[in-house]
Amino acid sequence: MAKNVRIFHCSPEAVFDVLRDGWLYPTWVVGASRMRGADPGWPAVGTRIHHSFGVWPFVINDTTTVLERDEPRRLVIQARGWPVGEARVEVEVEPHPRGCRVTLRENPVEGPGSLVPGFIAQPGIWFRNRESIRRLSWVAAGRAANA
């Protein structure tokens, strides 16, 4: 499972302010290119956001579903990206003297992507999520500073 950790200069609540707004998903998730909709009540367990991934005009429409939510500490989602497959993504947020410590874990769980050996897949996932967690930190801290 690819794991990325970063110290954010904002509160755990500020991180969840971003996670609660499904429309912000493409601003911080590398590869997500646009939002098409969010279920009422997002991010309640079982709700979905409807997004696309890829580079226009080569985009694929799919969804991400909330599996677990323990705000402001933890959000677990299942991101679909067929034909590549699906991944379980965990976002854990802990208080830290400088704001909060965010851990992002991702593991392919369904489809062809889950058949790729970890030692091949995980470095690429880690590299992509390094940028995703960086973007999430900027969005959360920026929104908190302007609140």
Where in the sequence are the language-model features?
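Glycine-rich portal/gate segments that line the openings of hydrophobic small-molecule binding cavities
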Residues: 36-82, 88, 96, 101, ...
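Residue-level detector of beta-strand structural context in well-folded domains
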Residues: 4-6, 64-65, 91
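Beta-strand/loop substructures that line and gate deep hydrophobic ligand-binding cavities in soluble
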Residues: 79-131, 147
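Amphipathic alpha-helical segments that line or abut small-molecule/effector binding pockets
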Residues: 13-16, 130, 134
